[in-house]
């Protein structure tokens, strides 16, 4: 969402961060900080129905669901939006080619109706996170012919695992030199990787199979598991509400492909968090592993760029 940034140090941190505090803020006050720092963690997305505000999950307060509710910060948010407009007046987001699928264009008003179904599914308290995602996906197919859901979900096939491994390598690069680089999907090289490379997932300099990470224990039916589900649900809800997953909000993908990409981020985060837990010597995934994972993914996914071939490939695989 941002086109300007302060160049980070080799360890990925701001050069003005000292003892986990902003040196400029601590010594000179908030009013002299760079404008881009003052905007964090707010993100503004201008759409045909208005400006939608979300907050970045790179913020510790957002990750922990702490701080003052946005509804109680209206005056501050108006000031932040005015600053945002001074930095990004030249940036235009194109929303005039919205599609439910590649061959089904829809109006913005029709999209908002579909979005209601997604958000309603994500806020259902009687469903697990997986069931919420399935229900949200089903709501997008209400006007399409969708094959019935099988009684049991088959394990991922070879191509599915390769696609996940390709996305995993781009969103969670193991080489530190790629941590601070934007994610650029080259369709041809991505397709070659799908065909030629075995599906391996690297976390903290160790390679794992899909099964090793997917089968690693997670907390179940306790307070921590609820916190994890809440964090992941909030992440999904924020991307949908902010329109950061399709069209002008993400690589001009169709709504269905864009949402299914969001859905795929869940197993990617599950595997990365498992890898972090294994590296710590833990017996199961803990909330801290998921928080670190969500923060890294947020940074990468918000700056992802797809070329035309990649977008076409995603539309095919993610329908």
How should these model regions be labeled?
Residues 112-319:
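Hydrophobic, aromatic-lined core segments that form the binding pocket/scaffold
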